[in-house]
Design a protein with these regions (language model features):
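Catalytic-loop motifs flanking and including active-site residues across diverse enzymes
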Residues: 35, 73-74, 174, 218, ...
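Short Gly/Pro-enriched turn/cap motifs at secondary-structure boundaries
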Residues: 1-2, 128-130, 238
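Gly/Ser-rich oxyanion-binding loop with an adjacent helix/lid
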Residues: 48-130
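Short, flexible, solvent-exposed loop/turn segments with mixed acidic/basic and small polar residues
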Residues: 12-15, 234-240
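Residue-level signal for inorganic ion chemistry
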Residues: 10, 190, 241
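ATP-binding N-lobe of GHMP and related small-molecule kinases
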Residues: 1-65, 79-89, 258-261, 272-286
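ATP-dependent small-molecule kinase catalytic core of the GHMP/sugar-kinase superfamily
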Residues: 93-234, 249, 253-286
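Short cationic amphipathic helices and targeting signals
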Residues: 238, 243-250
Length: 286
């Protein structure tokens, strides 16, 4: 799901005084390009650009804390470089560039409910922003940077978790259920497959060596509160990425009640209500 309110911006410029590219993230110069280097090199290869450039990225929400900052961040960089160098890349080429930096980034190029096809890495919007106007309530339980990144965590899990293979083998079945639920706007089915897939992913991480424990006590309190609301008849479900933050999806008519209930949980740092959002786009040509 692409959302509004939480977003990343990117600005690109030349700097002839430098010998190599520079990435500035949230006003802090990074020691290297890190995971975005393959994306930068791929994009610059279209015009054989050799001059060093400066990429300035800003996330308006905590970075590397389980809120998909790499997805939105890489997507914004792809759009910025495509415009700066006048590459005029196709949608498929933009997706190819984004996925080199983050496996989640292609989805942030598109609006609404987005499907990334594993066969050819094509990407498409299944339902646009206004076609199924659900609410997403983000419960931030920590702003700390993860001790183990999602990418490194996945590598560890692949090598050490006895549940990894079964989780991967279930993905086709889960994605088909999710696609059916989204296309038919079956809220209960989408909630069922989303929560089940989330639980399986965290089972894989927590059975890795060393165990990858991303959820905290407040995360579990949020889950318990969600279960109570669901039992009382509220249309609601949750998902949690590789981090401690809880994302609640609910019907618009229940949003105020959900927020009120979640405020009763101790140690929640912030509760953010968002809608489905637009894909990555150019906002300033200057």
């Amino acid at each position: 799901i692409t959302i509004d309110t939480l977003y990343s911006t990117a600005k690109v410029s030349f700097n002839s005084s430098r010998k190599k590219d520079l990435w500035i993230l949230n006003d802090i110069e990074q020691e290297s390009l890190g995971q975005i280097e393959p994306t930068i090199n791929y994009l610059k290869s279209f015009k054989a650009v050799k001059d060093p450039c400066v990429i300035e990225s800003i996330n308006n929400f905590p970075t590397a804390a389980g809120l998909a900052s790499s997805a939105s961040g890489v997507a914004s960089i792809v759009i910025a470089i495509n415009e700066f160098f006048n590459l005029n890349l196709s949608e498929k080429e933009l997706v190819d560039a984004a996925i080199l930096g983050s496996g989640s980034a292609p989805r942030s190029l598109y609006p609404g409910f987005v499907h990334l096809n594993k066969k050819d890495y094509s990407c498409e919007t299944i339902l646009d922003t206004n076609e199924w106007p659900l609410k997403i309530i983000i419960c931030q339980t920590s702003s700390d940077k993860k001790l183990v990144s999602s990418r490194e965590g996945m590598r560890i899990s692949k090598l050490t978790s006895s549940y990894y293979e079964a989780w991967v083998n279930d993905q086709d079945n889960d994605i088909n259920k999710a696609l059916k639920a989204i296309k038919t706007k079956d809220f209960d089915l989408l909630g069922e497959v989303s929560e089940d897939n989330c639980k399986k992913m965290h089972k894989v991480m927590e059975t890795s060596q060393p165990p990858l424990i991303y959820r905290n006590l407040t995360t579990h309190l949020c889950i318990q509160k969600i279960k109570e609301m669901k039992f009382s008849g509220i249309g609601i479900f949750y998902t949690i990425d590789a981090g401690p933050q809880v994302k609640i999806i609910c019907k618009a008519k229940h949003a105020d009640q959900v927020i009120s209930e979640m405020k009763s949980i101790p140690n929640i740092q912030d509760i953010i209500e968002v809608n489905l959002g637009q894909g990555a786009r150019l906002i300033n040509e200057g």
